[in-house]
Design a protein with these regions (language model features):
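N-terminal membrane topogenic signal
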Residues: 3-21, 164-171
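Alpha-helical transmembrane segments of multi-pass membrane proteins
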Residues: 22-39, 184-186
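Membrane-proximal helix-loop-helix units in multi-pass membrane proteins
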Residues: 81-142
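Final/C-terminal transmembrane alpha-helix of multipass membrane proteins
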Residues: 165-191
Length: 193
């Protein structure tokens, strides 16, 4: 079993994959924290706002671990002949694409962007509104997923680009992990005191 997983992944590759999984979750958590910190401070005080931010960072770390484990397991579905570096870059690409769509979905909710009234009326009058919604989502999402994957599979430049991007994001993510540690210390301090 150990030799099987070593052929699929290297230790450095798994660390790089974890950092890639952690980056979008921490980035988005920090954006939401900075968005909400002012009204939290006004509502309570700065120490409570820092506590809420700390819980957010700890939760982002826990999410990162879960996403990493699922992604690493999905890596076993990739072609066996791929080198570990290529597999890690491919999985990183999938994580980043999925994360961008997750952020877009949450932004639409946060900005209160809904379907226009005409579209809602059309969906009400149709016999299968969910099918229409799913088809529309499929038309929008599919190219944004398949085109980068196709470019990745066909082009060595895309593979190199993804590997370089993951390497650059790794340094920033290490900084985010430091914030996780600070958040854990703050949460422990707040709960003890």
């Amino acid at each position: 079993m150990a030799t099987f997983s070593i052929r699929r992944y290297s230790r450095q590759g798994l660390w790089s994959l974890f950092l890639t999984c952690a980056f979008p979750l921490h980035f988005w958590t920090l954006i939401l924290v900075f968005r909400d910190i002012s009204w939290l401070t006004e509502r309570t005080n700065a120490w409570d706002a820092i506590g809420v931010a700390s819980y957010g960072m700890i939760f982002a770390f826990a999410e990162s671990v879960v996403v990493f484990l699922v992604t690493a397991l999905l890596g076993f579905l990739t072609p066996k002949q791929w080198e570990p570096e290529r597999r890690i870059a491919f999985l990183g690409l999938l994580i980043l694409i999925t994360s961008v769509w997750g952020m877009i979905a949450q932004l639409l909710f946060l900005w209160n962007i809904f379907l226009p009234a005409q579209a809602i009326q059309f969906l009400r009058s149709s016999s299968h509104p969910l099918r229409i919604i799913y088809a529309a989502c499929l038309v929008v999402v599919t190219p944004t997923v398949l085109l980068p994957i196709y470019a990745f599979i066909r082009s060595n430049k895309a593979i190199m680009f993804m590997q370089n991007l993951m390497e650059r994001l790794s340094l920033l993510t290490m900084f985010y992990l430091f914030f996780d540690l600070l958040g854990l210390i703050i949460v422990i301090t707040r709960n003890i005191g």
